[in-house]
Design a protein with these regions (language model features):
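A short, N-terminal "cap"/entry segment at the start of jelly-roll beta-barrel domains
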Residues: 1-58, 64-66, 159-163
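Short, conserved beta-strand element in jelly-roll/cupin
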Residues: 70-91, 99-104
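Short beta-strand His + acidic residue motifs that chelate non-heme Fe in jelly-roll/DSBH
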Residues: 67-68, 85-86, 114-116, 124-126, ...
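Short, charged/polar surface micro-motifs in flexible loops or helix N-caps
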Residues: 50-53, 61-64, 81-84, 90-93
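Short acidic-glycine-tyrosine-enriched beta hairpin
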Residues: 90-128
């Protein structure tokens, strides 16, 4: 028997689903990251998984985001496309939420620290207390590991299987 590995992308994915034997599918969280990203506006932070305060956010990257920062480390896994991450120091005293990331004003991002160009399968650290932004010439998908924050959107009723 031959097996074929197929990697999903924003342009080509199969939703899949939860197959239950003797239970209610509503008891299980199932969503397809590519489907969530395909329906999202660029740079929305849409939770696709949650464990206590920790979340995985699906982010559609298209164009250049505004500057963001968090008081804690985050990581971003590129699932589709190519994403350039740009990092700058953050203005001293810039307020940040206790959890999650938030947009920061353009002038709060000061000295250029560097950049990372990441493609499918590349994991990029988004360091605590530093400004970052991401950009992509075409649609790309990130999975961001973070803590639930003020801009995290929960759309369980829209994205999870219910029957």
């Amino acid at each position: 028997m031959a097996y074929e590995t197929r990697l999903a992308s924003l342009a080509s994915y199969e939703k899949g689903g939860v197959e239950v034997i003797d239970d209610d599918p509503k008891n299980y969280a199932f969503s397809n990251i590519f489907e969530v990203a395909s329906l999202a506006k660029p740079f929305e932070l849409i939770a696709v998984a949650k464990n206590f305060e920790y979340v995985l956010e699906a982010v559609r990257v298209e164009g250049t985001s505004g500057w963001r920062a968090a008081a804690h480390d985050q990581s971003a896994l590129v699932l589709d496309g190519e994403v350039e991450f740009t990092f700058k120091t953050l203005r001293a005293g810039q307020a940040l939420p206790e959890s999650g990331s938030a947009g920061v004003p353009e002038d709060a991002a000061e000295t250029l620290m560097g950049r990372v160009v990441a493609r499918r399968g590349h994991l990029t650290l988004l360091p605590a207390g530093r400004a970052y932004r991401y950009s992509s010439p075409g649609p790309a998908v990130l999975l961001v590991q973070t803590v639930e924050g003020p801009e995290t959107q929960f759309r369980w009723a829209e994205i999870c299987q219910t029957a």
